């Protein structure tokens, strides 16, 4: 059975599952240098994605559209070719505790001039299904709790097993968007008005708070205002909780909360305010999760899946894991809406077969497009060993291999790789990518050696937990050590068949260092490079390696290694 999952709104994507196996997931931002969080505005994108894999719409048994904003149903205005189309979808959240798999049956999905029927499941259903079905718990036939938190919903706790899923409770009345909203009131991303949201702010705040310290007085202010605005018995808080299905009302309440916070905290350093708010939410999350586990004592292993945009917060993920409440914690590489097309397809699979495991690979995104070297570049075959030698000479390389990784983080398929041994390399990479100076660069490390370098250094193939750099390694790999000593580590097993694994092995043989800097290969504000030509046209890194071919700028004869002053003279990073 072929099931095609579709996410139309931000982080638009098309995913195809065939007989329990993920065939592909095409996130629109990873096509043609599209903007981050690209929507699907034209249904022709679905036809194109299928055609690229030798299929047409008639080959699909079921189309599934991810639900969206709305208490009873959602609406989508799109095009099919040049014709406007209105589609109806399921709401954001299920309407009753056992209603995760209640579908809306729709028609009017026009693909290749054919009018097709479709199903739609609540948006949150997709998060639960994608997190659980890709988890090791599903594969082992074990039940799991599932935490979904993001957007305009409270943190929602579910229990899932192979037979079904049930909503248990909301942990506390704070929407996931509140974390990003804090950045619009304090710090470098402060905005003069309530209008507009930067979907990337939350990740930037996690980096920025490394400049700060937690102030318990500030935390106390947030606790007081939280009770007044959200959790207490006052009329304002009760009204807020009564309107939880109204995204606009929830956002207004969050803005009011931060307006009051600004008045109370105007004399405090903004970086300390943001760090303290992060700490306040982390403590709240851990405390309320512990209480929920006392209320829901269920037989079997205590496993936890985490989904929703807040699942990208590596510090909160680690805090939950470190509580000891759970035997194991799983976060998929796409906990945010980048996984919603997969989630929509998994929802339909669950409706047919139960919450069964999905066979999948993180490298199931778009394939690299073929193309010649643009003018000014030379192309030549290049082995992995030769590439490792270039990296060992302190020259960064755009590394493009195989199909793109799923989710928002570069995992070695669409990466800029570099030696981590130079203290200037982090600044250099941030400069060429137009990123703020405080942004970290992640290490990609051989899994078996990660515990020697990082604490805990446990397997982390998708960069979703927090690690500290061990003191004896900080001076050896300064480019991947964040301001607070942490590292957003990606581990990769020596048994992996991905090309980046062989590269790490060869680089370790040359240098004794089993890791490299790893940051995403993309235009500023855009998705991953779709091909080598796009990386060459960008041109801010002089070497581009793509599936065994090295593209080199013709003007590059013998550049000084990074760290030499003349090589650091580049356009100023926006602040």
From Swiss-Prot:
SUPFAM superfamilies reported in the protein's UniProt record: Actin-like ATPase domain
Single GO biological process annotation from the record: biosynthetic process
UniProt-listed Enzyme Commission number(s): 2.1.3.-
GO MF annotation terms: transferase activity
Keywords: Nodulation, Plasmid, Transferase
Function per UniProt: Involved in 6-O-carbamoylation of Nod-factors.
Highest taxon above the source species: Bacteria
Similarity comment: family membership: Belongs to the NodU/CmcH family.
Cited InterPro entries: ATPase_NBD, Carbam_trans_C, Carbam_trans_C_sf, Carbtransf_dom, NodU/CmcH_Carbamoyltrnsfr, Nodul_NodU
Protein name, entry field: Nodulation protein U
Protein's gene: nodU
Pfam families: Carbam_trans_C, Carbam_trans_N
